[in-house]
Structures are given as C-alpha cells and as structure tokens.
C-alpha cells in the first residue's frame, strides 16, 4: 500500500449531513411483464465450467483496501478509485496507492461520481454529497425512512436512487428535491414493477444519457428516459452464458463506453459482458475464479477499458484487462 498522502476525517451526522433476447423501442414486450417460469430443480455446477476461448479478459492486478467489509466502488474521469467499506470512503490513485480516507459515520453501500466529479453516497436511507476533496456539501433523506439505497447514478441535472426496500427508482435534482418515482407497479398497463427478492438493485446512466435499471427478479434490463418513460428493455432467463438465472440476477452492472453491459451475478458467480442489445459478448471472470459464497461483486470501468471487480470475499479490488488477440 502506498503512502497515504492525505487523510480527511469528516463525520456525517445522521440528521444533517448524511429463450431469447427481448428488445423493444418505446414499449416493452409482454414477455418482460411476466416473471420467469416457476423454479425447478437444477444444479448450477453444470454451468460453472467455461470454455477458455470464451474468456476475453485476464486478471492483471489487485488492490487490497484496509477494510474489514467492502461495499461499493466507482472510478472517476482520472481513473481514481473510490471504495466504501466499514464506515469510511477510501480513494486510490490509478497505481493503487491510497491517497485519502474519509470518515462517514455510517456504512455507505454504494458510491458514484457525477459528471462534475462530485461524490454521491448511499447511506442506508440517506444520500450524501461530497466534493472531490471529501468535504460534505449536502445530504437528504430518501422519500421514505424505510428506504434501503443500493445504487445511485448522477447526471448533470438529475440524481437517480435505487430503493430496494420500496422497489422504486427515485429521481431527484442535485439539491435533493424529488422529481418523480420511476418503475412502480402499474395494474393498468399490467407492468409488474421491480421484482427484488433480495437487496440487489442496480442502475446506471449510459453514454447516450439514458437510465438503465436492472429488474433482478425478472432478469431484465430496463431503459428509461429522464422523464421516467420506459423506452426499451431486454431479458434472457437462462443459466448458460447467454442469460441470467436464480432468484435475482444480475446483482450489479456497469456500462462500457460503447453501451455494452458488464454484469456480475450471485449463486452462479461470474462476470460477463453483453452488448447494448443484450447479446452475450464475452466472459470477464469465470465461476472458478471466485471463492465459494462470493456475493456483492460491485463493478466499475476505467478510461482504459479495464474492468474493476470489488470482491468482498477476498477483500480485494480485482482488475481485469482485455486479452491481447
């Protein structure tokens, strides 16, 4: 671990500063509105072996943050790495040396950067905003104190918050004013809303400025405008590499500059890439590269196209680069 250049100690107070691919446009296929078929007995061991020819990435290095527990991760435009663990936020330079550590006072299960490089944190039911130096700027409590924030995505004028407890995406302006609720169950259109059997519920903004939300219980990716309108979706329920299986996968995603999706799963633990329409492209990390019981693989992508995998089981940031052809 490199020398810590700065240490910023900031306590955020609780009250104050804290099968096939389906793709549609401007509508969602009726297949997306139906939960996967009833569960049957299966053996995921049959799917753990991956043809090496399908693995397009190799692990090039690891970073070991000094945390007991790891929660969330993000990269900024300069490839600095932001990791939350315990009740702190640690920042690493691209070489993997820790350059800052910020006391939060609460566990932050997710972290992201806005286009103007502000730091957004999800602290249980509170969104906290810091500047690049770790100074607390503002915070707000999500619409309900029962909220469990699992993901935050920030645009220039919009902040999207995934609330896994209430099964809704909350859209705010940067000051924390609620603009709308997105993706709720709608009996009139027969949309089932977000199916979230466990607290894994991720979202991200793509390079074209649209919001993507994982509907994990349906193994579906849903694409929304910033006005909250569903404009497209794709889904593939399957245990093979083409799709996603189990109760609720993928658990995490990141979006590459070309709009492709990097995904991680639990149960059948693996990291893959699907193209913008959902077609399987390649494996980043196969099941045999993870310890038994691994869950919570948060993902990030740096400017070089490297894929960062936060592995809570090993306590590592694992960095994967594309294999040379």
Label each residue range with its predicted role.
Residues 2-325:
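Eukaryotic scaffold repeat domains enriched in small/polar residues
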């Amino acid at each position: 671990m490199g020398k810590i250049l700065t240490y910023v100690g900031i306590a955020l107070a609780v009250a104050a500063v804290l099968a096939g691919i389906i793709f549609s446009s401007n509508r969602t296929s009726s297949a997306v509105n139906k939960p996967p078929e009833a569960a049957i007995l299966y053996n995921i061991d049959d799917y753990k072996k991956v043809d090496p020819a399908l693995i397009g990435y190799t692990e090039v290095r690891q970073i070991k943050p000094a945390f007991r527990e790891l929660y969330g991760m993000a990269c900024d435009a300069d490839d600095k790495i932001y990791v939350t663990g315990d009740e702190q936020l640690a920042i690493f330079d691209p070489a993997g040396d820790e350059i800052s550590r910020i006391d939060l006072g609460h566990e932050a299960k997710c972290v992201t950067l806005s286009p103007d490089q502000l730091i957004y944190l999800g602290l249980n039911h509170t969104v906290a905003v810091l500047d690049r130096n770790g100074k607390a700027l503002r915070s707000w409590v999500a619409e309900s104190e029962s909220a469990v924030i699992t993901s935050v995505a920030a645009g220039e004028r919009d902040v999207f918050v995934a609330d896994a407890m209430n099964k809704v995406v909350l859209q705010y302006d940067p000051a924390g004013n609620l603009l709308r609720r997105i993706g709720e169950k709608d009996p009139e259109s027969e949309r089932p809303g977000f199916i979230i059997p466990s607290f894994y519920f991720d979202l991200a903004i793509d390079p074209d400025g649209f919001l993507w939300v994982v509907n994990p219980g349906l193994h579906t990716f849903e694409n929304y405008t910033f006005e909250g309108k569903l404009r497209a979706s794709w889904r593939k329920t399957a245990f093979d590499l083409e799709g996603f299986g189990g109760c609720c996968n993928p658990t995490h995603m990141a979006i590459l500059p070309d709009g492709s999706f990097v995904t991680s799963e639990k149960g059948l633990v693996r990291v893959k890439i699907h193209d913008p329409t959902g077609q399987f492209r390649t494996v980043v990390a196969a099941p045999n590269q993870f310890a038994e019981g691994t869950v919570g693989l948060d993902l990030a992508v740096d400017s070089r196209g490297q894929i960062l995998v936060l592995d809570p089981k090993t306590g590592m940031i694992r960095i994967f680069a594309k294999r040379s052809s």
